[in-house]
Amino acid sequence: MTIFDNYEVWFVIGSQHLYGAETLRQVTQHAEHVVNALNTEAKLPCKLVLKPLGTSPDEITAICRDANYDDRCAGLVVWLHTFSPAKMWINGLSILNKPLLQFHTQFNAALPWDSIDMDFMNLNQTAHGGREFGFIGARMRQQHAVVTGHWQDKEAHTRIGAWMRQAVSKQDTRQLKVCRFGDNMREVAVTDGDKVAAQIKFGFSVNTWAVGDLVQVVNSIGDGDISALIDEYESSYTLTPATQIHGDKRQNVREAARIELGMKRFLEQGGFHAFTTTFEDLHGLKQLPGLAVQRLMQQGYGFAGEGDWKTAALLRIMKVMSTGLQGGTSFMEDYTDHFEKGNDLVLGSHMLEVCPSIAVEEKPILDVQHLGIGGKEDPARLIFNTQTGPAIVASLIDLGDRYRLLVNCIDTVKTPHSLPKLPVANALWKAQPDLPTASEAWILAGGAHHTVFSHALDLNDMRQFAEIHDIEIAVIDNDTRLPAFKDALRWNEVYYGLKR
């Protein structure tokens, strides 16, 4: 079972009574056929549920009102099978608070050249019915997605499925609770921000809990539960000699297991699906949570270090969006650069907390090594390299008057040399279009040093995310040129300033 099983998407057909009962009967018949086929063959993440035809203002308004109040409804897919006068949609769309996609399709793929007549023309009017609907969306400044293509086309299936992921993610985000263990890392700017504005814009709430509250739960974990979790570690990872039975760091592994079990219990009891820690506020914990955080991220929790609640929330959102897709998604930080003419590279990592979902196939190494930052006992962590291939890094920042999403398209590469003294998981990548352009654009746009790294999602997914939440997006990819990028930032200042 996945999060998508908790939701459904309503399929709504727009028409009108002008064409008579027989035409409406055929429209209904076509709709049933299309919905059944999409549910069976399109590999959509959510089930489509066909609703009654929308043929009058009252019917359409009722559907939109019901969608708002049905917690299982993640959004609406609308198909204008015939011409559906768009003034009928104004009241419904004005109250709709769920994501909306217009599927610009028709029942037949090819025109029946020899038999086409006016009955056929009146029945299959998406070509101009869809434009009428599009006008009222533009007139009302109604944000909605549009997918054009035949309902049997695999590309259309893929695009509808991607939108469904956004719709479900948006509903999940409205219920998301972010727990900050301790506060922000002292004097750090980008990890701070307006939590009230974030809840208004995205729906997630952010609150702080004292580390002592967590420690109380951690200390209540029994030895039997710890031993059972250690058994899971033994089967899942390659343990270094120091962490094996009778190793001199075995007790550190047991303490890491205790922290993991305590953290998970605390998060479950509070209904939290994202959290932060900071190494400046660990009072009562024997070590910085490393292994615990890595494993919780792999289970779908959002996380970021140093109290960075925006990145923690974004990671959870992107985890939901990517559920069931190939590739992983993790908290990440641009840590250090490799400057070599024609082969500039970025080494991404964090002190400990990189999600194993992005790891290469072989078992991660479980080790305990010294960590100077934080002043605690040596923490346990998983060490691994990252899968290669196309990926993205994304950052959500608070500009005071709005949110900006930055996305850099990257290409992860194999580490050319072993890293025998680096005791943390890492990812190595080439930034698009090149490191100087990418880093300068990122810095000029105010991008954070913390990011969400993903092999599973791509730029199109993040564009949809920005659109569905009505926030600014700044893209850095192979098409980026700094003068044009700077111009776009200036234009966005004007656009969003006027939009306020």
Swiss-Prot record:
Give its E.C. classification number.
5.3.1.4
This protein's record includes keyword Manganese: yes
Keywords in alphabetical order, please.
Answer: Arabinose catabolism, Carbohydrate metabolism, Isomerase, Manganese, Metal-binding
Q: Name one Pfam family in it.
A: AraA_central
Establish whether keyword Methyltransferase is in the entry. Answer: no
Signal peptide residues are none
Gene Ontology biological process terms, A to Z = L-arabinose catabolic process to xylulose 5-phosphate
InterPro entries, sorted: Ara_Isoase_C, AraA_central, AraA_N, AraA_N_sf, Fuc/Ara_isomerase_C, Fucose_isomerase_N/cen_sf, Lara_isomerase
As to how many cofactors bind and how, the note says: Binds 1 Mn(2+) ion per subunit.
What Gene Ontology molecular-function terms does this entry list? Answer: L-arabinose isomerase activity; manganese ion binding
Assembly, in brief, is: Homohexamer.
Q: Which HAMAP family match?
A: Arabinose_Isome
UniProt family annotation: Belongs to the arabinose isomerase family.
Q: What is this protein called?
A: L-arabinose isomerase
Which organism is the protein's source? Salmonella typhi
Record gene name = araA
